[in-house]
């Protein structure tokens, strides 16, 4: 489907259908967490699913979590190379936010090295961050790695408009308490607003 087709399901004429879809999924997956955070997390999952889809069919999957996970696997199994333009734009974009890098208590927050690393880390962590290469290259979002003592990425952080909008560990898990404290410390030091984890 790709990012160009994401606008279609979010068109104003589809608003009621979209809200009904998300509310049904929210009650299915987040019965224990019916709050704005759960709603936002589900919307992000749906958006990511739509970005990774190659076709326009099944924009309202009956099981969003399974459909998202399958789309993620399919995305990483595609043998796509990045164009020279995307590669160069990506490299230029990440240089613009090197100032967000940070170290604390053995953890490191750093920029991705290149688009290939984005795809490789996303596949390893089983998260869809590899689908964000174009968004980083177009400077519409910033992705950083949360790394362990050996500089191995253990999570991905998304920053938009000076706000942390996502922090995902392997398999889309939320950070544990220790990691959450590192992220909060980083946000405070870099003057980022925590909009969501």
Mark where each language-model region is.
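Glycine-focused motif/segment detector
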Residues: 1-197
């Amino acid at each position: 489907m790709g990012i160009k087709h994401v606008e279609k399901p979010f068109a104003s004429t589809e608003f009621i259908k979209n809200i009904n879809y998300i509310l049904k999924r929210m009650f299915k997956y987040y019965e224990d967490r019916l709050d704005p955070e759960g709603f936002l997390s589900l919307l992000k999952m749906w958006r990511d699913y739509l970005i990774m889809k190659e076709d326009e069919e099944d924009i309202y999957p009956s099981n969003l979590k399974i459909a998202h996970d399958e789309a993620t696997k399919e995305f990483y199994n595609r043998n796509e190379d990045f164009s020279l333009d995307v590669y160069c734009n990506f490299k230029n974009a990440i240089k613009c936010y090197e100032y967000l890098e940070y170290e604390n208590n053995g953890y490191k927050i750093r920029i991705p090295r290149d688009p290939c690393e984005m795809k490789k880390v996303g596949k390893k962590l089983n998260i869809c961050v590899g689908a964000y290469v174009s968004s980083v290259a177009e400077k519409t979002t910033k992705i950083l790695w949360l790394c362990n003592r050996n500089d191995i990425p253990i999570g991905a952080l998304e920053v938009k408009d000076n706000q942390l909008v996502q922090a995902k560990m392997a398999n889309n898990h939320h950070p544990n308490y220790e990691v959450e404290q590192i992220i909060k410390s980083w946000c405070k030091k870099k003057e980022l607003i925590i909009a969501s984890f």
